[in-house]
Amino acid sequence: VLIIAVLFLTACQLTTAETYSRGRQKHRARRSTDKNSKWTRECTRSGGACNSHTQCCDHFCSTATSTCI
């Protein structure tokens, strides 16, 4: 009877640990997509205001007018 009780408790611990790790993995995936969305930026279309070439979709910012060309 003691051996059966030990086996049952071991099985319960393994099942709980597996379920817990799955839940944490889902949250990790969600966090990584949040981080990725922070890193992606939208570009400014032609005619929009800019300060550098990297802001423009066509990667050309006129320094004279501060607009994307």
UniProtKB/Swiss-Prot annotation:
Expressed by the venom duct. GO terms for molecular function: ion channel inhibitor activity; toxin activity. GO terms for cellular component: extracellular region. It is found in: Secreted. Keywords: Disulfide bond, Knottin, Secreted, Signal, Toxin. It holds the Pfam family Conotoxin. Residues 1-17 form the signal peptide. The keyword Secreted applies. Disulfide bonds join 43-57, 50-61, 56-68. This precursor corresponds to allele E1g. Has not been merged with other alleles since they may differ due to geographic variation (see strain in PubMed:19606224). This is Conotoxin Eb6.20. It comes from Conus ebraeus (Hebrew cone).
